[in-house]
């Protein structure tokens, strides 16, 4: 059984550690801010609650190309496709961004792996057949994959190595941008 926790909060922190470096190098990724809903109470005090953000964890630009991604973390040897882990609006946003020419992906951590790479870039072309099966099953019935096995990540996704400064996504994003240019 594959368990999920905060689905990526600690991973977000690793990425955030590198944001000042990206900015200093002329690369900027901005984290989406959560939205508040509520009203102004007596004496002008805001009363409200935090509502979930509508987009993905990070968005911005890399050398003139739009980039958007969401951080996910899982225990075990597969990436669950349940709604707790991947919300339909997140997959939709990833697909739409990809179709518009953006670099769009899930940054997935396999938190319990003892050896080998544990961070992978799951881009839309790899995710699409799995997510479309989940979406089809949700809408018209049928069987859908419950998760994407680790072997698929090792075979089809780019691995990222963690260093002292966190996770460096620059080389990965540059490689994805190059591949996209070749396909045009």
Segments from the language model and where they lie:
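Conserved catalytic cores of phosphodiester-cleaving nucleases, focusing on short active-site segments
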Residues: 58-60, 64-76
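Short, solvent-exposed loop/turn segments at secondary-structure junctions
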Residues: 36-40, 76-79, 113-115
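Mg2+/Mn2+-dependent nuclease catalytic core
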Residues: 74-93, 98-100
């Amino acid at each position: 059984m594959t368990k999920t926790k905060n689905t990526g909060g600690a991973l977000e922190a690793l990425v955030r550690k590198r944001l000042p470096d990206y900015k200093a190098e002329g690369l900027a990724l901005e984290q989406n801010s959560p939205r508040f809903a509520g009203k102004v109470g007596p004496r002008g005090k805001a009363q409200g609650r935090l509502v979930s953000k509508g987009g993905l964890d990070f968005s911005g630009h890399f050398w003139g190309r739009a980039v958007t991604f969401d951080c996910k973390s899982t225990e075990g040897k597969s990436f669950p496709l349940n709604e707790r882990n991947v919300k339909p609006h997140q997959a939709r946003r990833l697909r739409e961004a990809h179709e518009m020419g953006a670099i769009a992906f899930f940054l997935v951590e396999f938190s319990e792996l003892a050896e080998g790479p544990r961070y992978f870039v799951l881009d839309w072309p790899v995710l699409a057949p799995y997510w479309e099966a989940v979406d089809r099953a949700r809408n018209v019935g049928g069987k859908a994959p419950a998760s994407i096995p680790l072997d698929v990540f090792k075979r089809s996704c780019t691995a990222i190595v963690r260093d002292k400064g966190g996770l460096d996504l620059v080389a990965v994003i540059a490689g994805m941008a190059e591949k996209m240019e070749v396909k045009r």
